[in-house]
Amino acid sequence: MASLKDMRVRIASTKATQKITKAMQMVAASKLRRAQLAAEAARPYAERMDAVISNIAGAAAGSPGAPVLLAGTGKDQVHLLLVCTGERGLSGAFNSSIVRLARERAFALMNQGKEVKIFCVGRKGYEQLRRNFDRQIVENIELRSVRQLGFVNAEDIAAKVIARFDAGEFDVCTLFYSRFKSVISQIPTAQQIIPLVVEAPAAGAGPAPSYEYEPEEDEILASLLPRNLAVQIFRALLENNASFYGAQMSAMDNATRNAGDMIRKQTLIYNRTRQAMITKELIEIISGAEAI
C-alpha cells in the first residue's frame, strides 16, 4: 500500500493537472466563439459560390472547351485525398475522426485497383496517416506558424493542388475536413472538389432559368473555378478551426471533471488510510499501557 506521503503527492499532482485542463478549457472557450462566427460567416458565401458555378457549369459541362477543373480528365484512376486536420492534439476525436474517414476512403479506393495519393494539411493528420500511407503522401503543409487563418493560406494550398492537377498527377481530388455543428458535435466530411460535382436540380423545381453570359461560360468558369477551389478549402480550414476548439473545450471539460472525481476518490482513500493508521497507533499505545 502507498504511504501517506505518496498519496499526498498524487493528490497534489492531480490537482495541478486539473488546473491545467481547466485553463485549457477556458482558453478554448474564449477562442471558440470567434472561430465559430468565422466558420458560419464563410458558409453562405461558399455555398452560394458553389451554386452559381454549378448553374453556369450546367450549360458548359458538355462543351468541348469546358475547363478541365470542371470536365475532369475523363478518368478516375488516380485519386488525391486532401486531408485537413489540426496542428495540435488534446482535442478528443477531432483529428482521428477525419483521419479515419480518409483512411477508409483510401483503402476502399485501393481495393478497387485505384492509385491513391495524399496531400496533408496539418501536422496531426500527417503523423497518423504516414503509419499506413508513408509512400502515398506527396506533400504536407503545416500551419503552426499561422496566428490567424486567412484566405491567402487557402489560395496557397489551392495553387499547389491545381499545379499537381495540371501536371497530370491525379484525376480526382477529395477534400476531407470536420464540419462544425456544435461544441459536442463535429461531422467528418468528404467533398469532391476536382472535377467539380454539378448539383442536379431538385425534383419538382421546374426548368432552370436561362441566362446569357458575357464573356462566354467557359471563360467565366476558367476564372471562377480556381477561386472556388480556394474558397472551398478556406471554408474547410475555418470549419476545422471551429471544430478543433469545440472538441478541445469538450475534451478539457471532461478531463477537468474526471480529475475532480479522482481527487475525491484519492482524498477518501487518504483519509481512510490515515484514520486506520491513527487507530492502529492508538491500539498499540493502549495495549502497551495495559501490558505495563
Curated annotation (Swiss-Prot):
Gene: atpG
UniProt subunit comment: F-type ATPases have 2 components, CF(1) - the catalytic core - and CF(0) - the membrane proton channel. CF(1) has five subunits: alpha(3), beta(3), gamma(1), delta(1), epsilon(1). CF(0) has three main subunits: a, b and c.
Keywords: ATP synthesis, Cell inner membrane, Cell membrane, CF(1), Hydrogen ion transport, Ion transport, Membrane, Transport
Record-level Gene Ontology MF annotations: ATP binding; proton-transporting ATP synthase activity, rotational mechanism
Cellular compartment(s): Cell inner membrane
HAMAP family per record: ATP_synth_gamma_bact
Entry membrane topology: Peripheral membrane protein
Pfam families documented for this protein: ATP-synt (PF00231)
InterPro entries attached to this UniProt entry: ATP_synth_F1_ATPase_gsu, ATP_synth_F1_gsu, ATP_synth_F1_gsu_CS
Keyword Transport attached: yes
PROSITE patterns named among the record's database cross-references: ATPASE_GAMMA
PANTHER family: ATP SYNTHASE GAMMA CHAIN (PTHR11693), ATP SYNTHASE SUBUNIT GAMMA, MITOCHONDRIAL (PTHR11693:SF22)
Protein name as it appears in the record: ATP synthase gamma chain
Keyword Ion transport appears in the UniProt entry: yes
GO annotation, cellular component aspect: plasma membrane; proton-transporting ATP synthase complex
